[in-house]
Amino acid sequence: MKVSLPAFENARVLVIGDVMLDRYWVGPTGRISPEAPVPVVKINQIEDRPGGAANVALNIATLGGHVQLAGIVGQDETAQALTQGVKVFGVEPQWLTVADKPTITKLRVLSRNQQLIRLDFEEQFDKATSQALFAQSEAILDNVDVLVLSDYAKGAIDEPKDFIAKARAKGVKVLVDPKGHDFARYHGASLITPNMSEFEAVVGTVTSEDDLIEKAQKLIKLHDFEAILVTRSEKGMTLVSQNQPELHIPTVAREVHDVTGAGDTVISALATSIAAGASLAQACAIANTAAGVVVGKLGTSTVSRIELIQALALNHGESGFGVMTEDQLAYAMDQARLRGERIVMTNGCFDILHAGHVSYLQQAKALGDRLIVAVNDDSSVTRLKGPGRPVNPVDRRMAVLAGLASVDWVVPFTEDTPQRIITRLLPDSLVKGGDYKVEDIAGGAEVIAAGGKVEVLGFEDGVSTTAIIQNIMSQK
């Protein structure tokens, strides 16, 4: 399936925050130092990569967005390396240079794809310097759609409430990657994106899904946020918004090599998507996929538009087409709804697939974007149709259905009616063939109560599985 992304080239974003240089010393190690019980690494590669807020800006640029970057640097060699690193990606930095502090640098020593140690070179920036950075950046707000505050608690983002208010007054969405024990600093932000540890540092231990949602809603009301996106590692993401149902997005990471910069990737993908016109739910799905790509890389990295398209397509393949379990189908439906797709569901035995079935399923598919066919398993068919049925076992019936162009997902159920599975999945439209009354259709009341529709379609006259079986038997 072709996955549609927003027009990232239309995105205009300002990133302000703690910029830093991620420096990597890499080499083999094969012995222990005689001076101390530590490995000796023979450095044969040195690499510099923009990190922190600079990595956010690079991710936006790599996706194709237009980005301006503001941050604080020292008068040193690492500032020059950082400047060169962002310019390679087409980002022109707006630095506030200070003479008495170094450019923040994170030096990592790696061997055999493993990080052995990290050394930090940094000093805290004071409030006056932070306010000078905001003042220097204020004019840029007139030319952007989204402001990102990338806070690593190094001092660049100190008391940003007034700047957030100025941005919101200009119609600019404000996204914050927060730090610290008090989110009141970000009062009025459109969206904050704490990880689970950062979230619990503010609200206390989260004991359940309901507890997480309740605590997030309290923060939203207290600090006038529009939404909170909690990133939860292997549990994916949870989006809690004002006056909207919560949204859980499962993780899509396949192999985790390094989580360095994953938070940067999330907020950059969110910012680029929102600035390009995506809904918040769509932006979260894109950001989740981007994070899944970047943690599969070593060190601070970016995600390109092509990588994102490929990953979204692969995710769709995994969430899949064809025969599924109920759990797999529930996830596939969540992904489809994030893409704004309408889901239609029907059910039946489909013992011997015939032209009437094909026509009916084509009509059902035309009512939406995705079609689910729930199929009675063998024991259920026998109870409903009697001895000698089904003619074809359930795995073969489902395989044939899955091969039809009109059918996206096929799922078995064991009961005599699909009441339970329909109630669990709650499609946007429930379809039944024949002369049923809507009020008599299993699961129909639940679908309607959830805001969905129930429709009855006619079968093709003179074509039925029973008639086909009788015709075959009469010719013996």
UniProtKB/Swiss-Prot annotation:
It catalyses: D-glycero-beta-D-manno-heptose 7-phosphate + ATP = D-glycero-beta-D-manno-heptose 1,7-bisphosphate + ADP + H(+); D-glycero-beta-D-manno-heptose 1-phosphate + ATP + H(+) = ADP-D-glycero-beta-D-manno-heptose + diphosphate. The active site is at D264. ATP binds at N195, M196, S197, E198. Residues 1-319 are annotated as: Ribokinase. This is Bifunctional protein HldE. One of its GO terms (biological process) is ADP-L-glycero-beta-D-manno-heptose biosynthetic process. In the N-terminal section; belongs to the carbohydrate kinase PfkB family.
